[in-house]
Amino acid sequence: MELINTIKIIHKCSGCKRKMHFVNTGKFRVNANGSRVDVWLIYQCEKCKHSLNLTVYERVRPSRISGEEYRLFLENDETLAVKYGNDKEFLKRNRVEFGK
């Protein structure tokens, strides 16, 4: 899996059992639950490759997401992954620390 060059984050890794650096995979996960949709940006522990999903949208109606952006999520658009991966407000909302 190719990793994207964005802000590294620090989070407790469930595989390593301690705080580790995580990197952006450039992949999104989209999950439909009835009439609602969840979208996550997937990060990965640099050491053990455990994944961490950062919430982009949670339990929203698909009509609240622009058709173009929704299509880009489904296509794992690298440019969109970089945009979210460098958005400090997005990262803060997901309660992660910024890496060095």
Predicted regions, residues:
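Short beta-strand micro-motifs in enzyme catalytic cores
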Residues: 37-41
